[in-house]
From Swiss-Prot:
Keywords carried by this UniProt record: DNA replication, DNA-binding, DNA-directed DNA polymerase, Exonuclease, Hydrolase, Multifunctional enzyme, Nuclease, Nucleotidyltransferase, Transferase
Keyword match Hydrolase: yes
Function per UniProt: Possesses two activities: a DNA synthesis (polymerase) and an exonucleolytic activity that degrades single-stranded DNA in the 3' to 5' direction. Has a template-primer preference which is characteristic of a replicative DNA polymerase.
TM annotation in the entry: none
Protein name: DNA polymerase II small subunit
Classification via PANTHER family: DNA POLYMERASE DELTA SUBUNIT 2
Subunit and interaction comment: Heterodimer of a large subunit and a small subunit.
Cited Gene3D superfamilies: 3.60.21.50
UniProt source species: Thermoplasma acidophilum (strain ATCC 25905 / DSM 1728 / JCM 9062 / NBRC 15155 / AMRC-C165)
Gene Ontology BP term (one): DNA catabolic process
Alphabetized GO MF terms: DNA binding; DNA-directed DNA polymerase activity; single-stranded DNA 3'-5' DNA exonuclease activity
Length: 488
């Protein structure tokens, strides 16, 4: 009983310290509170050392100093401690350098990047060996294999499908006859496809009659169940802190669960928040009427305070979405420093989208604005059955296959929406639904929201599926859902 009480007291004191730091990061750290905290732990600290600690604003650093000190901490001790080599993490974060450009040449480079990356994937498949350029195909007879980006799709008056594709040098019309299987395939403008067919020179301009359409697609993956203790990646999205409809009690219950004694909770090593972590302001007309917290920086400070209860050995990754305080156009950058500084050291920040490396596994994280477009473009896809839209993205190996629509894009020399590496796990959000699927061995989720039904959703007759925590085991096929929805 004495041991339990002592451990519980230290844990409570540590959480209160973290809250002191989070609350004070927006202004000046409370020197008096920190001195009292050191004194309560039997440690004296010099004024110079205190200045150093206030600069770093890290509760984990303070705890480590107290744990390893001999009762007195001076400035040199702090400097030696913070300069020690850091332990290597089991994750990698690389931040691409994406600058805002808007010239015609920048758009051209982006489409060239998309074509070259996806063309390389398509031509590496055995069925596309011997592919040639469109210019060469137009001079050929018989069967050809070409790769192109779709610029036009239409139906002829006779019910045939007409597709215009282009590569870096030329374009050609391809016809899918109405009695051929590929006529039923959904072809989107701007996607990159391979075509196997026969060239006809009978008309003024050569035409390819299509026998087969080849997509970049995801190869079938065999998940080797490793003999390894479970390591869980926990996924949530669309928290919307600051909104009057933010489900605060359920979010706190979820964080308490991660910090608790449940065996599954103890296996959570990573927590991913895939965008719209706050509600923001000015996102839509009269939004201020729906807000409990008007200041976006205060919204992030509140989120940071909720996350202090997440154990320090759990790495938290936070990504922006369309409600967050970054540019709307994708790829979205990480949060600015004034927001990042509000959070604890175990919180890392990702751009949107991002391919995260966790213990040798690829975890592709995307907020998911393009899912609205895919629902409109893919027959059978809807907000309650978002899996068809997600799988259409994986088939096309691009997070936003059709340019434009509801997904604004930044033109850049590199197209960061191409899915170059096959993911082990694919995480999305944005829709406020919850859907788990498996496509050719790629486990995916449309992560649950932590916001109740909004007035707009009522008008659209959409019922969100809130307050669900999805756990993926990195070393097996296991997927677990923890439901914190108290309205069921």
């Amino acid at each position: 009983m004495v041991i339990w009480f002592f451990y519980g007291f230290r844990k409570i004191m540590h959480l209160s310290l973290k809250r002191i730091i989070v609350k004070c990061k927006m202004s000046q750290l409370d020197r008096t509170s920190l001195i009292q905290y050191f004194n309560s732990n039997g440690v004296l600290i010099s004024p110079e050392a205190l200045d150093k600690l206030i600069k770093y604003s890290s509760s984990s650093l303070i705890e480590d100093l107290i744990k390893n000190s001999d009762g007195y901490i001076d400035e040199k001790y702090v400097e030696r401690y913070v300069s020690r080599p850091k332990v290597r993490n089991d994750y990698e974060v690389y931040l691409p350098d994406v600058r805002f450009n808007a010239s015609i040449e920048d758009f051209r480079k982006m489409f060239v990047s998309k074509y070259e990356k996806l063309s390389k994937i398509i031509t590496s498949s055995s069925s596309m060996r011997g592919s040639i350029s469109i210019k060469t195909a137009k001079r050929s007879q018989g069967e050809v294999k070409v790769v192109g980006m779709v610029s036009e799709v239409s139906m002829t008056k006779n019910g045939h499908k007409r597709i215009v594709i282009e590569d870096l040098d030329d374009s050609i019309t391809a016809i899918v006859m109405k009695d051929r299987g590929p006529v039923n395939e959904i072809i989107l403008e701007d996607e990159v496809i391979g075509i196997i067919g026969s060239v006809s020179q009978s008309s003024k301009d050569p035409v390819i009659f299509v026998n087969e359409i080849i997509r970049p697609d995801i190869p079938y993956r065999v998940i080797d169940e490793e003999k390894h203790e479970p390591v869980y990646v926990a996924s949530i999205s669309d928290i919307h802190v600051g909104s009057k409809t933010f489900r605060k009690n359920e979010f706190e219950a979820m964080v308490r669960w991660i910090s608790g004694s449940d065996p599954d909770a103890s296996r959570v090593k990573y927590l991913i928040l895939s965008g719209d972590v706050v509600d923001g302001i000015g996102v839509y007309p009269d939004q201020e009427n729906d807000l409990e917290i008007l200041n976006p920086l205060e919204q992030y400070a509140n989120l940071a305070e909720y996350l202090v209860d997440v154990p320090e050995d759990v790495k938290v990754f936070v990504m922006p979405g369309n409600h967050d305080t970054v540019r709307l156009s994708e790829p979205q950058p990480v949060f600015p420093g004034k927001i990042r500084d509000l959070f604890e050291p175990n919180v890392a920040f990702l751009p949107n989208p991002y391919n995260l490396k966790l213990e040798g596994k690829n975890v592709l994280v995307y907020h998911g604005m393009s899912l609205n477009d895919m629902i409109e473009l893919i027959p059978g896809a809807n907000y309650d059955s978002i899996g068809k839209a997600i799988e259409a993205i994986l088939v096309r190996r691009h997070l936003s296959p059709k340019y434009g629509g509801n997904t604004p894009m930044i033109p850049s020399a590199v197209d960061y929406h191409v899915i170059e590496e096959v993911p082990d796990i694919f995480i999305t959000g944005h829709i406020h639904s919850h859907y788990i699927g498996n496509y050719k061995g790629v486990r995916y989720v449309n992560s649950s929201t932590w916001q109740s039904q909004t007035e707009y959703q009522k008008m659209m007759n959409f019922n969100p599926k809130p307050s669900k925590l999805t756990l993926f085991d990195l070393y097996s096929r296991s997927v677990i859902v923890k439901d914190f929805d108290t309205t069921l």
